[in-house]
């Protein structure tokens, strides 16, 4: 199901349960928009990158729901890419227990601490216009 689809120019998307965007920055470097729901999604993205000879330089998270940041930790560990998110989304990406805590109103019980509500933490930086590639 993890299929790379060309849109136009240097823009692609990865067909998956939680679609991901991919932008070629040059012949070898790419950035990813969201990273899927877990390390398995990250592994499949890494396979697509390797098959195309691409190096992941950054992940831009649109928001901090677990199905959009779940592959961050795996991909960052494998590629040393930077991860960016805006505002409070950056904080939730760094501290994913906040996602189910907001739902519950306090530290979430075990039933709310699973990969569908709480991704693994990743080292995200604040997304500002200055960190975006030219043309974004």
Regions found by a protein language model. Give the residues of each.
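Intrinsically disordered, low-complexity N-terminal regions enriched in serine/proline/glycine
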Residues: 1, 11-12, 59, 83
């Amino acid at each position: 199901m993890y299929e790379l689809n060309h849109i136009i120019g240097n823009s692609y998307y990865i067909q998956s349960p939680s679609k991901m965007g991919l932008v070629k920055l040059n012949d070898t470097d790419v950035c990813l928009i969201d990273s899927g729901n877990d390390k398995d999604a990250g592994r499949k993205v890494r396979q697509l990158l390797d098959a195309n000879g691409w190096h992941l330089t950054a992940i831009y998270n649109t928001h901090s729901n677990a199905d959009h940041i779940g592959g961050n930790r795996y991909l960052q560990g494998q590629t040393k890419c930077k991860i960016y998110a805006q505002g409070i989304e950056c904080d939730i990406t760094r501290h994913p227990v906040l996602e189910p805590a907001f739902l519950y109103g306090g530290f979430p019980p075990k039933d709310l601490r699973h990969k569908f509500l709480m991704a693994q933490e990743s080292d995200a930086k604040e997304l500002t216009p200055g960190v975006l590639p030219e043309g974004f």
